[in-house]
Each structure stands twice: as C-alpha cells, then as structure tokens.
C-alpha cells in the first residue's frame, strides 16, 4: 500500500524507528537495575548447585532477569506516567516526554512477560508455580508508593524472588537456606532503595509519593546503616549454613567496606551522593558472587 505516493513503512521499519523509545522505557541503556536483580539470582544458583549450575538454568535465569527487569521498568513507568514529569530525575523518561502510549507500554509489558514465561516452561513444575509470585510482585510494586511508606519492602520481595526460583530449578525444592538468602536480599534491597529514594525525597514530598526515605525522615542514615548491618549478619549466617570459608568471608569484609563508603557518600543527603551510593551496590552484589565462585572453585 502507498500513502500519497510513498510506501507505508513495514512493521520492521516502524519497530526500528521506535527502538530508541523502547530502550528508554525498558532501561536497557541503564543496566544497574539488571545487575541488582541478577546478583542475588546468581548467588542462589551457585549455592543451590554448589558452584556448578546447569548451563540451561544459567541461560534461563540470566536472560529471564534481563526480560523481567525490563518488564518491571515498563510497568513502573506506566504506573508513574502522570508523576514522572514532576520529578527532576525522571522527567526525561518516555511517558514524561509523551513519546509512548499506554497501549504501547502495556503491549510491550505483555510481550516481555510472555517470553519470560516461555523460558520458565523449560524448568520444572515448582519453578513454574513460583513464577506466578514473580509476576505478581513485579506488577504490584509500582503502585505501592501511593498507598504505603514501605514500597521498598515490596521491591525487595520482588528482587529476591529469583532466589527461591533458582533453588527450585536446581533442586526441585526450596530449602530453608534459600529463604535465609532471600531475607538477606530483601533487607539489602530496602537499604539501597532507601538511598535511591533519598535522592528523590524533595520531589516525592511535593507530589505525595511515599517511600522509606520519607518514613525514616532524619533517621534515614541510621536506618540504612542498621539495614546494612543486618544484611551482613544474615549473609554471615548463610555462609555458616553452607559451611563457606575464607573466600566468602573476605567478600563480606569487602561488602562491609563498601557499606561504610556508602554511608560516607550519603552523609550530606544530597541527591547526587545518594544516587551514587545506590549505584555502588552493584559492587556489593559482585563481591558476594566472586566470593561464592572462588569458594566453590577451590573447595577440596
């Protein structure tokens, strides 16, 4: 078909033209969220398999993390489509710039979730059953900031959900150790996402968005410190349960140093420093994973 003498663009051409918008909507150009979701999932795969996860499960979970994090960003922007324009850090996002429609975003969300579910079908019945929890958490988190001061707890539950799924995929069971690691990840997520919320606090107060940063108020730094100490304590318990040795313990020392550095960054509560402290948590996840890899690699 032609329009005014010109051929209509093909579906592929239309998609190519929209690709920069979709990349912005899924945050593929900002991988920090993917890293923070991926690290605990890799911890679980390594612990469940004692350092030797199947290549099939490794592919499924790495690709699944990328897809579900992208889906989470899409539904988050859909939920925040009327408020992102009022927040300095988010006013450049596709919805805030009127670059994407609601139908487009929901369609993209459905595609990403659908492909993720297809991946899960190659695991086992227990993992498939648990995947329903992942979808429920990813879909509800964006709306929590309007109803509770604890949306970070829901985010933590969502970001840690790959842990029971990874154990289920490797062992066809979710042992008690998995839930201890899950707890550590939830607490850690609340800590770093509180720092993220501290960066947006002034804008959030103006538009009525709730967060732990607002809940904690002037006690925010102390609350984050307490959560970080608790994270270390639970991770130490995880190591004790799995009889992990020096490499893992050294990784926890590195994590402690990184937490101290983050406290140094947020001491003035500036948006720039709080966001930098949030980003630094990528190295926390990487340090723990490296400790686990070395632990199982050199285990007698």
From Swiss-Prot:
The keyword Transmembrane applies. It is an enzyme of class 2 (transferase). GO terms for cellular component: plasma membrane. It is found in: Cell inner membrane. The chain crosses the membrane at residues 32-52, 55-75, 108-128, 149-169, 178-198, 222-242, 246-266, 278-298. It is a multi-pass membrane protein. Its EC number is 2.5.1.39. Its cofactor is Mg(2+). One of its GO terms (biological process) is ubiquinone biosynthetic process. Coiled coil: none annotated. This is 4-hydroxybenzoate octaprenyltransferase. Its main location: membrane. It comes from Hahella chejuensis (strain KCTC 2396).
């Amino acid at each position: 078909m032609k329009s005014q003498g010109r051929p209509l663009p093909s579906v592929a051409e239309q998609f190519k033209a929209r690709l920069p918008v979709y990349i912005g909507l899924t945050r593929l150009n900002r991988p920090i969220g993917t890293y923070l979701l991926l690290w605990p999932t890799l911890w679980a795969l390594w612990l469940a398999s004692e350092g030797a996860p199947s290549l099939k499960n490794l592919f499924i979970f790495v690709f699944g993390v990328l897809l579900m994090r992208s889906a989470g960003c899409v539904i988050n922007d859909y939920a925040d489509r009327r408020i992102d324009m009022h927040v300095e850090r988010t006013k450049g996002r596709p919805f805030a710039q009127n670059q994407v429609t609601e139908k487009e975003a929901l369609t993209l969300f459905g595609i990403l979730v659908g492909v993720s579910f297809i991946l899960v079908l190659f695991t086992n019945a227990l993992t498939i059953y648990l995947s329903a929890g992942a979808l429920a958490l990813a879909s509800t988190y964006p709306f929590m900031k309007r109803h509770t001061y604890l949306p970070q707890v829901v985010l933590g539950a969502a970001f840690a959900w790959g842990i029971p799924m990874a154990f289920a995929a490797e062992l066809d069971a979710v042992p008690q150790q998995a839930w201890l690691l899950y707890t550590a990840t939830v607490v850690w997520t609340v800590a770093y996402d509180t720092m993220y919320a501290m960066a947006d606090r002034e804008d959030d107060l103006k538009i009525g968005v709730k967060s732990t940063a607002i809940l904690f108020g002037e006690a925010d730094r102390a609350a984050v410190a307490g959560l970080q100490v608790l994270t270390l304590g639970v991770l130490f318990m995880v190591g004790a349960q799995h009889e992990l040795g020096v490499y893992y313990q050294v990784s926890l020392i590195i994590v402690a140093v990184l937490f101290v550095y983050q406290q140094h960054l947020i001491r003035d509560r500036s948006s720039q420093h709080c966001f930098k402290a949030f980003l630094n948590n990528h190295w926390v996840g990487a340090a723990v994973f490296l400790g686990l890899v070395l632990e199982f690699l050199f285990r007698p």
